[in-house]
Amino acid sequence: MQNSILTLPDPICEPCIASKQTRANIPKSVNSRHSGLLELIHSDLHGPLPVQTRIGAYHYWITFIDDASRYWTVAPLKHKSDAFAAFKAFKALAENQLNARIKVLHDDKGGEYMSKEWEELCTTSGIKRIHTLRAELYQNRVAEYTNRTFKEGITTMLNKASLPSFFWWDAVSTFTHIHNRSLTSIL
């Protein structure tokens, strides 16, 4: 008698598998985490994406991740040069809502983070800057891992819903909303 369990098809989620294919491994590491909100913000810019959004003509997104809560804030950008305006908006909203100040900003030292106006704002606001080496993704692992999680999540969402890729910002917004309302091991 043949075992009926062996004849059942393997439940494989093809959109999940397709979205998790990567080029390089970003190692996970347990480091000490800051305990206060806004004590450390990780940031990274992703893009350009090969297709612009259906509304707004966006090609990039920038992430701001609070180290203590792992709360994600994401903004769409048309150009890399829009990153500073996105940071100013994030800083104003986060500091106002949490009644706290950003103490440290960690980024990958990309050109979008190195403008004179960005440096001046951080200096006058008392924000310490931490830059990683450009080729060492693991040094900015929180932001890099978040972007990787975004790519996997939105690819899965778009594939599962059979939506065209120009809906990527809608998927990023939805994915962020779901993440920020889900329990994490941090909390």
Model-derived features: positions:
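Anionic group-binding determinants
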Residues: 1-187
